[in-house]
Amino acid sequence: MPATVVLTFRNLFKNGRTPMLVIASVAQPLVWLVMFSQTFSRLADTPLLRSLGYRSYLAFLVPGMMVLAVLFTALQSGLAMVSDIDRGMLDKLRVSPISRVSILLGRVLADSATMVVQVAVVLGVGTLMGARVETGWLGTFGMVACVTLLGVVWASLANLIALRSRNAELTMVAGIFVTLPAIFLSPAYFPLRFQPSWVQTVAKANPASYVIEVGQSLMSIGNDWGRDARMLAVLAVAALVAMPATVAAFRAATH
């Protein structure tokens, strides 16, 4: 456990030495939040949208931008892994008595802390713009937890790609190839029932869609604690499955 704590702070301090990466991963969702909420608000703030229970297009948009922030942070986690490989950091850790699990857990915990801050910033800006979480602090906690757990799963997959490829360009391309469709083929910008049938079909296989829908419900419609608890459980199981797969890839990469 002490090794995990040390590595967590090491990764956090490393992020602190390149603050532009953290700022950029938050700035892009914020730019999209402001741009889309202002550009499409008159188009989307219609009786039809409100008939679905959403208070405003801004409140509808915030959860999707929270997810976008953590997905980009997850991609950066994979790129950081490639950087550690290239600089020989993993070789140094490999010959140390630190377990492989502690090394990866330290990275995941650092990523999780970063994601919580980013999600809070996006939600805070959305609140300043007029959005409100109708389910209060408990709903806010549930929304942040779901989004962060999704980010942990995504970061584990990004690290898995990084360990397999050992190539920053390939990790970046693969990450973008997965991340952008995960956002656009989801209810992040418009309710699924307003979108083409093929998008609705693809969205059903998109884990980001379910997290975004939970967030949108907690923002505007109300809480369904049974559904929210199931979502948290599924994400926790997914994280527990993704982590061992990444550990196995790490063992193979440092064998």
Residue positions per predicted region:
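Hydrophobic alpha-helical transmembrane segments of multi-pass membrane transport proteins
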Residues: V31-Q38, R55-M129, L150, A158-N159, ...
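Aromatic- and glycine-rich beta-strand/loop motifs that create alpha-glucan
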Residues: M1-Q28
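Short, membrane-interfacial amphipathic segments enriched in basic
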Residues: M1-T8, W154, W198-S209
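Membrane-interfacial helix-loop-helix junctions in multi-pass membrane proteins
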Residues: K14, L48-S51, I183-V241
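Alpha-helical transmembrane segments and their short interhelical loops
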Residues: R100-L180, W225-V247
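Residues that define the loop-to-transmembrane-helix transition and helix capping
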Residues: P19-M20, A59, V101, E169, ...
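Transmembrane helix segments
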Residues: Q38-A44, A162-A205
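Short cytosolic juxtamembrane segments of multi-pass membrane proteins
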Residues: A249-H255
